[in-house]
Structure formats: structure tokens, C-alpha cells
UniProtKB/Swiss-Prot annotation:
Superkingdom: Archaea
Species classification: Archaea, Methanobacteriati, Methanobacteriota, Thermococci, Thermococcales
Domain EngB-type G: 26-210
Binding site for GTP: 34-41, 59-63, 76-79, 156-159, 189-191
Family indicated by similarity: Belongs to the TRAFAC class TrmE-Era-EngA-EngB-Septin-like GTPase superfamily. EngB GTPase family.
Record-given protein name: Probable GTP-binding protein EngB
Amino acids binding Mg(2+): 41, 61
GO biological process, one term: cell division
Length: 216
């Protein structure tokens, strides 16, 4: 699956900022990725008002889904990691498809939103490290950065986290994010209740402007 560079229109800005240069800026492409069952599809609904197939069973979203939102393209990637009811070889194939899609389209992706379960992530990361393995969330973040894709980490399930800053500091250490960048990279949210959604939305558009500004 290849993104079309022909899908090009300017992104929304206040009227007074629109000029001929802005008209040349391609439509923004935003990908949402994360483990299965971290609230990715719920978050997309909170941001766009558009429903994508979601449910309580891990791995409900198994195909790449594209959504048009305010003249931007939202891409909901299948959840990676454990997928209930699917053979391991199918899970690996889906993971490979995600990797190949992102590699093939890296230059056209303006921002990636990596959604993590703020309550479960620390324990999952510790468990993987105890086995001597690189945690999949950490590996995926590094993969996105190696492709030079600006990445925001949406730390979901804020309503279930006792010490939010402690969790963010832990993730920042594991993701190797400098102290000066923590507030730009990690946005604690609750997709279920809508907490901090506007902050995340503002950060997404800020990154888009920075990314596309370098292309002009």
C-alpha cells in the first residue's frame, strides 16, 4: 500500500496566515500505531468524531484503515503484539505489513502518534527486559525515529495512572528521550474520558507545521 502524493491540499490555518506558499503544502498524513487494545481507535474517534472498528478483544483492527479528517489523512495501523485468536505466523505477517508500509511511506508521513497504555506499559517493559528482549513499544519508537518520522507518544488511560509524571519519566528513560524533549514527546491522555485531547491535537498540528515548513 503506497500513499499517493497526488492527494495534496493545504492544511487548515487561520485565514490571515494563508498565502500562496501554504497552498503548495501537501495534505498532512498522520499515522496512529501501538499495541493491541491500548485505545488507539477510541483516541481517533475522540480526535476526529469518526468511528473505526474497535472492541475489547486485542487485535480487532487487523487492516490498515484510512480516514479523512479536516483535509488530513489519518491512518489507523493494526495493533502490534498479542492478537487473541490469531496464529503466531499471522501476527508476524501483520507486524511485517506494518513495518513495510511505514518504510515505504516514511517520506510522506508528517507525524506518528504512538499510543501506549500508561498503566500497563511499565510492567510490560520490565517483563520484556527481564527476558533480555527489547520491549516492542521501545523498538517501535526507535524504528520511527530512525526513519526520521516525528513521533508523539500518547500515554493513554490517564484516569488509571496513580503517578503520571513517574510513568512518563520511566518511559522517557526507556525510550531514550532527552529531558528537554519530554513535554513535546509524551502527552498523557484519557481517550475514554477525553482528558488532554486538545493538548494532543495542538501538538499534532504543531509538528505538522514544523514538518511541512521544512518541505517548502
Amino acid at each position: 500500500m503506497k500513499l499517493s502524493t497526488a492527494d495534496s491540499i493545504f492544511f487548515f490555518l487561520p485565514y490571515e496566515f494563508i498565502n500562496p506558499i501554504i497552498l503548495l503544502i501537501p495534505m498532512a498524513t498522520i499515522i496512529f500505531a501501538g499495541r493491541s487494545n491500548v485505545g488507539k481507535s477510541t483516541l481517533i474517534y475522540r480526535l476526529t468524531g469518526k468511528k473505526v472498528r474497535r472492541g475489547k478483544r486485542p487485535g480487532v483492527t487487523r487492516k490498515i484503515i484510512e480516514i479523512e479528517w479536516k483535509n488530513h489523512k489519518i491512518i489507523d495501523m493494526p495493533g502490534f503484539g498479542f492478537m487473541m485468536g490469531l496464529p503466531k505466523e499471522v501476527q508476524e505477517r501483520i507486524k511485517d505489513e506494518i513495518v513495510h508500509f511505514i518504510e515505504d511511506n516514511a517520506k510522506n508521513i508528517d507525524v506518528a502518534v504512538l499510543v501506549v497504555d500508561g498503566k500497563a506499559a511499565p510492567e510490560i517493559i520490565k517483563r520484556w527486559e527481564k527476558r533480555g528482549e527489547i520491549p516492542i513499544d521501545v523498538e517501535f519508537y526507535q524504528f520511527l525515529r530512525e526513519l526520521d518520522i516525528p513521533t508523539i507518544v500518547a500515554v493513554n488511560k490517564l484516569d488509571k495512572i496513580k503517578n503520571v509524571q513517574e510513568v512518563i519519566n520511566f518511559l522517557a528513560e526507556k525510550f531514550e528521550v532527552p529531558l528537554s524533549e519530554i513535554d513535546k514527546v509524551f502527552i498523557p491522555i484519557s481517550a475514554k474520558f477525553g482528558d488532554n485531547i486538545e493538548r494532543l491535537k495542538n501538538r499534532i498540528f504543531e509538528v505538522i507545521r514544523e514538518r511541512q515548513g521544512r518541505r517548502v
